[in-house]
Design a protein with these regions (language model features):
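N-terminal cap/leader regions of alpha/beta-hydrolase-fold enzymes
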Residues: 1-160
Length: 160
């Protein structure tokens, strides 16, 4: 966990955008007619909120992505500031008991999603009562069967 946090703290949003952009360009070149979806968990979820600001991403799933409401170090914008640029679908799935995504952050994300998409067709916010950080991983103590089923069902519905 400490090593992961160390590496996470070395990243910047600009580097995340650069890396995702390079991967996106490669995929679009190799598979020009395919639908592109991005899935991220935890810090990958954080990156998944940044990713759909790039053109060409059809759907994105952010599972318990933390730190999306404040700027990262060496960056003058927060991931939430990029939401207006999203052209595809963005799903944000979190748990109500996740201390890494405080209530204030969850409320802000939910409010932004509702403002950008009142009908909830492109910006989908799902908060599962009682679920903690890491609820999708069966190997973790925080695994939450109901939240996991909700998450997998949303994901599989989009990908099929």
């Amino acid at each position: 966990m400490k090593l992961g946090s160390y590496h996470k703290n070395l990243t910047t949003s600009k580097n995340i955008i650069r890396d995702i952009s390079a991967a996106l360009n490669w995929v679009q070149e190799k598979y020009p007619k395919k639908k592109i979806s991005i899935v991220g968990f935890c810090f990958g979820g954080h990156a998944a909120v940044i990713a759909p600001s790039l053109k060409g991403i059809d759907s994105t799933f952010c599972f318990y992505g933390a730190e999306v409401t404040a700027p990262r170090k060496n960056t003058n914008f927060a991931p939430k500031d990029l939401l207006e640029k999203v052209s595809g679908k963005l799903n944000f799935i979190c748990g109500s008991s996740d201390d890494l995504i405080p209530l204030q952050d969850r409320l802000e994300i939910k409010k932004r999603f509702k403002k950008l998409d009142p009908l909830e067709e492109r910006f989908i916010y799902v908060e599962v009562k009682g679920a903690d950080h890491g609820f999708m991983c069966e190997e973790r103590e925080s695994f939450h069967e109901n939240a996991s089923l909700i998450g997998w069902n949303l994901l599989m519905k989009e990908l099929n």
